Every structure is written in C-alpha cells, then in structure tokens.
C-alpha cells in the first residue's frame, strides 16, 4: 500500500510537471515524524518514498529534470510543530507538494492550515 501511494504521488508530480514546460526541477516536502512515537517506523516509510523519487529521477522521463526532496520533522504529537515545518517548506523551500505528515492530528492541522490555503498537493 505504501509503495502504491509513493508511486501514485510520483506519477501525479510527473503529470503536473508536464503542464509546465519551464520546470527543470520540482521540490517536494517529506514531512514525517522522524522523532516521536512513530520514529521506529519512519526509516522504512521515508526510504520507500525516497526510492520512488530516485527511480523517477533515474528514468529521465521527468522533463529531463529532477524531483528534489526536503525533509521536515513533524514530531508526530504536536500539530504546531508540523504546521511550522510545513510553512517552512512552502515559504522557504518552495515545495509544490508535501508527503505526509503521518499522524492524524498533524495531518488535519497541516491540511487545514497550510496545504489547502496555499494550493499545495498532498501526497
């Protein structure tokens, strides 16, 4: 299931990139609970997401550009931290999509507070 979501997310980004002929690279945020109660599972989740990005970049079919990933730690249990990390990704890193966060309280807060108001794709 995780692989399907990662592949679907990368496919979505590839389709979006084909509509913008000037794009040479796209930045995607990976907002995970690198610390906190899900810390022990995040390595595998992050690895899967990054494998999908690596494969997409290696294919050369992404308008001859690349997908860049920036990471942020949502800490899983504090929506304020997750929102701050997502805002940084949008305002400083200029992400076009955010993968995560993966804890329900953080997910709702980030979607309502950052993703929807800024028109960012949620993966």
Name these PLM-found stretches:
Residues 18, 35, 104-107:
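Ser/Thr-centric signal marking residues that sit
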Residues 25-44, 102:
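Short beta-strand segments enriched in small/hydrophobic residues
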Residues 20-30, 60-66:
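Immediate post-signal peptide segment of exported/extracytoplasmic ligand-binding proteins
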Residues 2-5, 24, 61, 88:
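Context-gated lysine
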Residues 40-47, 55, 59-123:
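Beta-alpha junction/loop-to-helix N-cap segments that form part of ligand/metal-binding clefts
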Residues 1-21:
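Gram-negative bacterial Sec-dependent N-terminal signal peptides
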